[in-house]
Amino acid sequence: MPTPSMEDYIEQIYLLIDEKGYARVSDIAEALSVHPSSVTKMVQKLDKDEYLIYEKYRGLVLTAKGKKIGERLVYRHELLEQFMRIIGVDESKIYNDVEGIEHHLSWEAIDRIGDLVQYFEEDDFRIETLRAVQKANGEQSK
């Protein structure tokens, strides 16, 4: 299993390849706000652990294992963002909140959150009911 830091890199590499068709060390460094030398070290570790294939000065490609995990990590991130929106978290806080919790949840918890997101999205009335509860609770705490 990849570490949380490895997950961040795999997720970002997956997104860059999906968006641009490739991922360069400089692109990864910029996206993660880290030094290129840090990216090179991590990419070498990810290569050793068979998440990607890296050739110095030629670039990198995700292996089947890396693609599968990258896809799952992007799904997890997007699902948690959906969940935050459903429960009414302010849009400006969602990204940081998701970044803060995504590595600490089990895949079972992610699957259950997926069930909850599906439950709310299947019927708008459920979200309206949640908003009414939140409004009532907000007024009670004033």
Curated annotation (Swiss-Prot):
Chain sites annotated for binding Mn(2+) 2: E11, H77, E99, E102
GO BP terms, alphabetized: intracellular manganese ion homeostasis
GN (gene name): mntR
UniProt keyword RNA-binding present: no
HAMAP family, per the entry: HTH_MntR (MF_00732)
GO cellular component terms listed in the entry, alphabetical order: cytoplasm
Coiled-coil ranges from the UniProt annotation: none
Recorded family membership: Belongs to the DtxR/MntR family.
Domain HTH dtxR-type: 1-63
Record localization: Cytoplasm
SUPFAM superfamilies (UniProt xref): Iron-dependent repressor protein, dimerization domain, Winged helix' DNA-binding domain
Keyword hit for Nuclease: no
Reported function: Central regulator of manganese homeostasis.
Residues given in the record as Mn(2+) 1 binding sites: D8, E99, E102, H103
Pfam short name (any one): Fe_dep_repr_C
Xref: SMART domains: HTH_DTXR
Residues spanning the signal sequence: none
Protein name, UniProt field: HTH-type transcriptional regulator MntR
Spans through the membrane: none
Main location, first listed in the record: cytoplasm
Protein activity control: DNA binding is strongly activated by Mn(2+).
GO MF term list: DNA binding; DNA-binding transcription factor activity; manganese ion binding; protein dimerization activity
Subunit note: Homodimer.
Keywords (A to Z) from UniProt: Activator, Cytoplasm, DNA-binding, Manganese, Metal-binding, Repressor, Transcription, Transcription regulation
